[in-house]
Amino acid sequence: MKTLYSLRRFYHVETLFNGTLALTGRDQETTGFAWWAGNARLINLSGKLLGAHVAHAGLIVFWAGAMNLFEVAHFVPEKPMYEQGLILLPHLATLGWGVGPGGEVIDTFPYFVSGVLHLISSAVLGFGGIYHALLGPETLEESFPFFGYVWKDRNKMTTILGIHLILLGIGAFLLVFKASYFGGIYDTWAPGGGDVRKITNLTLSPSIIFGYLLKSPFGGEGWIVSVDDLEDIIGGHVWLGSICILGGIWHILTKPFAWARRALVWSGEAYLSYSLGALAVFGFIACCFVWFNNTAYPSEFYGPTGPEASQAQAFTFLVRDQRLGANVGSAQGPTGLGKYLMRSPTGEVIFGGETMRFWDLRAPWLEPLRGPNGLDLSRLKKDIQPWQERRSAEYMTHAPLGSLNSVGGVATEINAVNYVSPRSWLATSHFVLGFFLFVGHLWHAGRARAAAAGFEKGIDRDFEPVLSMTPLN
């Protein structure tokens, strides 16, 4: 092994303690990257990099299949999904598999099938990953030019981008077809407390679909997270799928314009940074969606949202005290505002008390009791159905506020259940992972821009003490 400490080419790279473990083409001497730099060693080995990506996909799909089967094995049909710490079965149930009216699970076999299909797929991907990592050609450019590429080849890069966009568009249309033709999906707004139905009358009006993008992200506006009917969600997927497929065709057929060639950095690390930035945005949006939206993420499976649990508590005690003779329309609370009902800043009748801050909540168990000016007093007195009472009492005790010791629910609610809501897990994990991805985006963007500018910031290794010391071996 050459003594790396004197090779200026690697002056910015940490050195391996034991170079004898390395393989040619993947070691520090031949690539300039040590083993822990992972796929950086494969930057110019398209065949090996393909193997790494396929194997990674295999690991992802293996986790999905194994975790799916684990959740099926532990599932208890008598308890709601959100009380059982499930994060995969709620997604399958939302797609309409295995559930009936009210979100009740009537058949777990589709969940089992899903797990097995993912496990089989992961085996295929795993084999492909190992083949390309160990046996296949190191580079694809010579044998399979269609799959080969050079990072600086702008035309090839936008062609690859186009192929990816088409695949994403097909994915969006798969949801459209499932919702419209293949059995439908679960609609939490179906009359009487939710059911599986086919979504046929899609919203395709561009003013409605793109109106969501123009809404404020704050308060009762809520940007795209405020979507509350499946026609809009599935119609949005028609638009997105179409845009992705048309954009993909465009990027395959065209070469980048001069402004794009000048403005963007065209290197492997730059593409990595762009991808990490996009994933960070996805993570932050997913966090807000699963935390606030009870249409795409039905409360029957994921548990109530925070505002929903709070409003459910107010509703439950309104029902109780009204039965005990309270006049809920005029009773005053300790602050002089209405104890059960009050008016919002814009005049609607809303629940009183601390839950006033959540007055713009919309939930399927509550909307039937609203009139043109907010909550309708006559409906609250005469029209409350048993299923609405049951559901609000259940949601009241399952707020997504799990603390460190897993005591779920509102802290002052003596009936709160000992659990952590899947909404808490999914929102927190997607925020944290989105943040890590964002930091990775900044890191790799900085490195890519520095490399493109012809310098690499870092510790000046020319005068490091270690350079004058005896090599370890």
Swiss-Prot record:
Keywords carried by this UniProt record: Acetylation, Chlorophyll, Chloroplast, Chromophore, Manganese, Membrane, Metal-binding, Phosphoprotein, Photosynthesis, Photosystem II, Plastid, Thylakoid, Transmembrane, Transmembrane helix
Residues where Phosphothreonine is found: T15
Lineage: Eukaryota, Viridiplantae, Streptophyta, Embryophyta, Tracheophyta
InterPro entries named among the record's database cross-references: PS_antenna-like, PS_II_antenna-like_sf, PSII_PsbC, PSII_PsbC_sf
Cofactor: how bound: Binds multiple chlorophylls and provides some of the ligands for the Ca-4Mn-5O cluster of the oxygen-evolving complex. It may also provide a ligand for a Cl- that is required for oxygen evolution. PSII binds additional chlorophylls, carotenoids and specific lipids.
GO cellular component: chloroplast thylakoid membrane; photosystem II
Function: One of the components of the core complex of photosystem II (PSII). It binds chlorophyll and helps catalyze the primary light-induced photochemical processes of PSII. PSII is a light-driven water:plastoquinone oxidoreductase, using light energy to abstract electrons from H(2)O, generating O(2) and a proton gradient subsequently used for ATP formation.
Location(s) in or outside the cell: Plastid, Chloroplast thylakoid membrane
Pfam (any one): PSII
Gene3D superfamilies, per database record: photosystem ii from thermosynechococcus elongatus (1.10.10.670)
Residue numbers bearing the N-acetylthreonine modification: T15
Quaternary structure annotation from Swiss-Prot or TrEMBL: PSII is composed of 1 copy each of membrane proteins PsbA, PsbB, PsbC, PsbD, PsbE, PsbF, PsbH, PsbI, PsbJ, PsbK, PsbL, PsbM, PsbT, PsbX, PsbY, PsbZ, Psb30/Ycf12, at least 3 peripheral proteins of the oxygen-evolving complex and a large number of cofactors. It forms dimeric complexes.
Organism name: Cicer arietinum
Family: Belongs to the PsbB/PsbC family. PsbC subfamily.
Spans through the membrane: 69-93, 134-155, 178-200, 255-275, 291-312, 447-471
Biological-process GO terms, alphabetical: photosynthetic electron transport in photosystem II
Propeptide stretch(es), residue numbers: 1-14
Amino acids binding [CaMn4O5] cluster: E367
This protein's name: Photosystem II CP43 reaction center protein
Topology in the lipid bilayer: Multi-pass membrane protein
Gene name of the encoded protein: psbC
